[in-house]
């Protein structure tokens, strides 16, 4: 039996995390998402184009819950989406979300005058899959960790998107890439809209 693309994606994330534990500085320097502007600490630009994808495979070496919750979300939403649209489409949705999350993170916070360091984590892609799940199965019941109350997927996605927008604009819960999460949702919305377009003969 062939393993799902989502399971393979989780396995790659775990493998990269092991490398991060062994070589944290080198991995973050090369593969985290760094700002387009020079860093005030050293006056250097550390951004490279591949980072708009590779950052999503990195997670905090000092906080195991970072990778744990991201992989839980990836499995929870990704496997169900893959079951309906297939491996290539779920990967396209995920990586489109990762890229739009990165671009949003690079552009929006600096425009708001928010200083940026490096960005890591799969959460932009996971938020994208969350929205795709809500668009595909709006009435499916989900039980979030916070609050642990069953609710339809459309409401879950709406509440989380609203919270991310609120925290991003107000600056609350700093240290979390709120606009990247919203950017990931935009990417997946574009992909799902493309899936729904009628095919021309």
Name every feature range the model reports, one short phrase each:
Residues 1-201:
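A detector for small-residue-rich transmembrane helices and their helix-helix packing motifs
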């Amino acid at each position: 039996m062939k393993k799902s693309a989502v399971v393979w994606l989780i396995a790659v994330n775990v493998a990269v995390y092991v490398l991060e534990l062994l070589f944290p500085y080198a991995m973050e320097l090369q593969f985290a998402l760094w700002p387009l502007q020079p860093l005030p600490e050293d006056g250097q630009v550390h951004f490279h184009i591949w980072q708009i994808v590779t950052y999503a495979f990195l997670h905090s070496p000092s906080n195991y819950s970072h990778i744990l919750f991201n992989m839980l979300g990836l499995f929870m939403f990704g496997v169900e989406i893959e079951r309906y649209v297939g491996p290539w489409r779920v990967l396209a949705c995920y990586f489109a979300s990762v890229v739009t999350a990165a671009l949003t993170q690079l552009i929006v916070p600096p425009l708001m005058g928010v200083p940026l360091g490096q960005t890591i984590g799969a959460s932009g892609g996971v938020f994208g899959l969350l929205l795709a799940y809500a668009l595909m199965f709006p009435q499916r019941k989900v039980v979030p960790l916070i609050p642990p109350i069953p609710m339809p997927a459309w409401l879950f996605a709406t509440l989380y998107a609203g919270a991310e927008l609120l925290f991003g604009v107000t600056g609350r819960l700093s240290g979390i890439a709120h606009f990247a999460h919203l950017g990931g949702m935009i990417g997946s919305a574009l992909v799902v809209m493309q899936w729904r377009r009628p095919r021309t003969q």
